[in-house]
Amino acid sequence: MTFIHPTAIVDPAAKLADDVKVGPWTYIGEGVEIGAGSVIESHVVLKGPTQIGCNNHIYQFSSVGEATPDLKYKGEPTKLIIGDNNIIREGVTLHRGTVQDRGETRIGNNNLLMAYVHVGHDSVVGNHCILVNNAALAGHVIVDDYAILGGFTLVHQFSRIGAYSFTGMGSAVGKDIPAFMMVAGAPAAARSINMEGLKRRGFSKDDIAKLNKSFKLIYRRGLTLEAAIEELTPLAQDCAAIVTLIASLRASKRGIVR
């Protein structure tokens, strides 16, 4: 059965699954929905409209579903949607969307958001991502599956972080990061493919070799992005990873980090 600490405040219009646990001094507002198996620790603030899936664990002093500080926001109904099996550590801030964009901020499944991470309005975090302490996403950012953002990484509005990519500590990301790349610095620059991450995720030696060749083609030969994509295309015929890489290059709207 649901356990709600006597000092917690839960709005009658909030919807909690039968086995949700709510710690002391937590506030859960109107329009909040929390799925089965979730644990909300002490001193958490949840505001709606916010949908939280199953088996999420939200730690103390996090602010989840607060309105965006975007000055264009005038109180319109917008959402925060969180999937399943996420760990949201201490002091994390997750803001709802704006009607000027998609109207919702979205966190996928199986993510780890470490202490003091910020996810701004209208951002989308995929699945199996790790955002290390104090990483901050400005509004409208997309983080694709299995990306890892190092501590104190800052990401500019409308940037996209590609799948399986990695940012070094303190990176300042102002452009799009292609899939599989490792970047570092302020401003962030591409250093190599995310070699260790790809090994851990079970990519074959052949795929890693082709991605390493692709990195050199994109970043070491002085090609335009269009020319690099053209030369990469033959490699994609028997390599799904190269297909993913090309798709991330074509999806870039801000230009890629160099």
Swiss-Prot record:
- Name the SUPFAM superfamilies for this protein: Trimeric LpxA-like enzymes (SSF51161)
The molecular function terms in GO held by this entry are: acyl-[acyl-carrier-protein]-UDP-N-acetylglucosamine O-acyltransferase activity
Highest taxon of source: Bacteria
Might you report a single GO cellular component term?
membrane
BP-aspect Gene Ontology terms: lipid A biosynthetic process
Note the InterPro entries from the entry. Acetyltransf_C, Acetyltransf_C_sf, Hexapep, Lipid_A_LpxA, Trimer_LpxA-like_sf
- Give the EC class as a word: transferase
Q: Where in the cell is it found?
A: Cytoplasm
Reactions mediated catalytically: a (3R)-hydroxyacyl-[ACP] + UDP-N-acetyl-alpha-D-glucosamine = a UDP-3-O-[(3R)-3-hydroxyacyl]-N-acetyl-alpha-D-glucosamine + holo-[ACP]
Please state which protein family the record places this protein in. Belongs to the transferase hexapeptide repeat family. LpxA subfamily.
Listed name of the protein: Acyl-[acyl-carrier-protein]--UDP-N-acetylglucosamine O-acyltransferase
Q: Which organism is it from?
A: Saccharophagus degradans (strain 2-40 / ATCC 43961 / DSM 17024)
Q: Which gene encodes it?
A: lpxA
